[in-house]
């Protein structure tokens, strides 16, 4: 009997049975009140307009922000879908999603947006972690209305609205009215890390990534700019880092492009912040400035060390090393312009110094500094990077090892990527924490390395349903209230040794949708099969909006696309 029930559950996975009495929204809002079963609907066309409250309409910057996002999120997608058929999951009516024909009780010509902040500083504040992103969305026979304290909340309301406007006979229909939605994020920090040091990305790919994140209410893009393989950040003070440390100069992220990208991200509600890893994962620095990385290549070759280039570490005895760290931490803070600079700190192997040709000089330098062990040397590097970041008025972010080894400043945000127990430990100790453990997008099932753990999805379907393991991963839920206050949120990590922009969206966004819902929606939204249907629909919408090209379906479905896709 148990086996039969499991087979039935797999047979119906990913179809419309799982979204009965739910709207086709992803991530799912905090509160949804709708008249399920009602045939009443609101009708709209691609000519629908925005009506802003005067407090935003009369401010040029606020008006520009909202106009840009209305055109990007509503006008353009509706124009592209005008003559398309609706998304479907089955030819069988009992398990297909609901057809959109209904009794039209109102034809909406406008979307009314009310900004409720007390002044323009409250309505349109600088984009930061912790700003008010809440909104309400009402669809009734009187019309469509979005209310929010800030423009960022209003923008998110537009993303929900475009998911509700389903094509039907050349127009758009919203059924189950009246609908009242109250929504806010569960977590403040809802991030995606991309690794451009292993495989590079075109500039247009970054824009599409931000648009895709914005569509599913993610708000932090973490760019891993350097590693052993390449150095992809343009430093004005040390230009040879990228001139010699990158394969092609046209893929290096120049400071002018980064500033444009950060500005674009801010328009879409996405913070863009940098990481340059130190003191390990730095072999590429040596291409531009020979000697700043300790030389253990003979040892790597003689010992046949796999991926040995990753363990090379900075040489403290070289006079340029700390000057470069100073410059990079300062430049990253200035160019990206937001609150955060990630200095890495992960996977340091002390053999990178003890096996190095420069080891005698390193020992001499340590003796002058009063550093007695190589563990203390590692701590010295970590503390030095943090001091430079804090001195420049920014907040350091680091990987978990810096905390685990006792060298994290209390102002530093700890990114837990491997040992999930450190999430509770660091948060209880008073550190701000972000969670990445279990959300590694380069792995099929991050929590199931042996593919036999009882908690894993059936490995026969490891590509079809690997998103479920990420969806179920929610250690934050188990923390007490006080500890949760120090968990800012989480980041899914796309380490890109086998990914570039040709397969990035297919590899990443199927499963990042599960993580995005886990970070945004209430912790009691837990049905992975419901998520699959809703995420499959949003994937279809993202293809139609022209920023998810290359992303495959989560499960069987029908998604008609414009001819230019």
UniProtKB/Swiss-Prot annotation:
The keyword Magnesium does not apply. One of its GO terms (biological process) is carbohydrate metabolic process. One of its GO terms (cellular component) is extracellular region. GO terms for molecular function: beta-N-acetylhexosaminidase activity. Hydrolyzes the non-reducing end N-acetyl-D-hexosamine and/or sulfated N-acetyl-D-hexosamine of glycoconjugates. May contribute to amoebic pathogenicity and may be involved in the destruction of extracellular matrix components. Belongs to the glycosyl hydrolase 20 family. Heterodimer of one alpha subunit and one beta subunit. This is Beta-hexosaminidase subunit beta. The gene is HEXB.
């Amino acid at each position: 009997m148990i086996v039969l029930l499991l087979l039935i559950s797999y047979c119906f996975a990913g179809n419309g049975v799982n979204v009965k009495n739910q709207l086709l929204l992803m991530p799912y809002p905090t509160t949804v009140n709708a008249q399920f079963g009602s045939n009443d609907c609101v009708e709209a066309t691609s000519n629908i307009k925005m009506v802003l409250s005067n407090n935003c309409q009369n401010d040029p910057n606020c008006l520009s922000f909202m106009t840009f996002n209305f055109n990007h999120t509503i006008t353009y997608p509706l124009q592209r879908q005008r003559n398309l058929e609706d998304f479907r999951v089955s030819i069988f009516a009992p398990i297909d999603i609901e057809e959109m024909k209904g009794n039209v009780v109102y034809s909406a010509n406008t979307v009314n947006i009310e900004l409720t902040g007390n002044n323009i500083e409250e309505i349109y504040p600088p984009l930061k972690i912790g700003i008010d992103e809440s909104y309400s969305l009402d669809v009734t026979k009187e019309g469509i209305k979005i209310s929010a304290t800030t423009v960022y909340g209003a923008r998110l309301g537009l993303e929900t609205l475009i998911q509700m406007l389903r094509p039907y006979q050349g127009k758009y229909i919203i059924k189950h009215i009246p609908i009242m939605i109250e929504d806010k994020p569960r977590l403040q920090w809802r991030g995606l890390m991309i690794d451009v040091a292993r495989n590079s990305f075109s500039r247009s790919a970054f824009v599409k990534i931000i648009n895709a994140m914005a569509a599913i209410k993610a708000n932090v893009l973490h760019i891993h700019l350097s590693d052993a393989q390449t150095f992809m950040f343009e430093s004005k003070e040390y230009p040879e880092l990228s001139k010699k440390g990158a394969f092609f100069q046209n893929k290096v992220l120049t400071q002018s492009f980064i500033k444009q990208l950060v500005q674009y991200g801010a328009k879409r509600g996405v913070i863009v912040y940098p990481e340059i890893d130190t003191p390990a994962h730095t072999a590429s620095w040596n291409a531009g400035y020979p000697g700043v990385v300790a030389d253990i290549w003979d040892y790597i070759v003689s010992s046949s060390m796999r991926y040995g280039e990753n363990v090379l570490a900075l040489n403290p005895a070289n006079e340029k090393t700390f000057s470069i760290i100073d410059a990079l931490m300062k430049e990253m803070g200035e160019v990206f312009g937001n609150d955060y600079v990630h200095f890495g700190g992960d996977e340091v192997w002390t053999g990178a110094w003890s096996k190095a040709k420069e080891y005698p000089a390193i020992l001499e330098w340590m003796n002058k500094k009063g550093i007695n062990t190589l563990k203390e040397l590692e701590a010295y590097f970590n503390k030095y990077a943090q001091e430079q970041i804090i001195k420049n008025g920014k907040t350091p972010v680091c990987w978990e090892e810096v905390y685990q080894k006792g060298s994290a400043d209390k102002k530093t945000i700890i990114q837990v990527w491997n040992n999930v127990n450190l999430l509770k430990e660091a948060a209880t100790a008073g550190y701000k924490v972000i969670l990445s453990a279990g959300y590694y997008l380069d792995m099929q099932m991050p929590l199931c390395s042996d593919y036999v753990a009882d908690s894993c999805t059936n490995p026969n379907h490891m590509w079809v349903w690997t998103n479920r393991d990420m969806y179920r991963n929610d250690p934050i839920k188990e923390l007490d209230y006080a500890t949760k206050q120090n968990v800012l949120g989480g980041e899914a990590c796309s380490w890109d040794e086998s990914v570039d922009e040709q397969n990035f969206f297919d590899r990443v966004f199927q499963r990042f949708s599960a993580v995005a819902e886990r970070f945004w929606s209430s912790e009691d939204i837990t049905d992975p099969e419901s998520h699959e249907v809703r995420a499959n629909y949003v994937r279809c919408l993202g293809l139609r909006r022209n920023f998810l090209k290359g992303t495959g379906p989560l499960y069987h479905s029908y998604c008609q696309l414009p001819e230019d896709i």
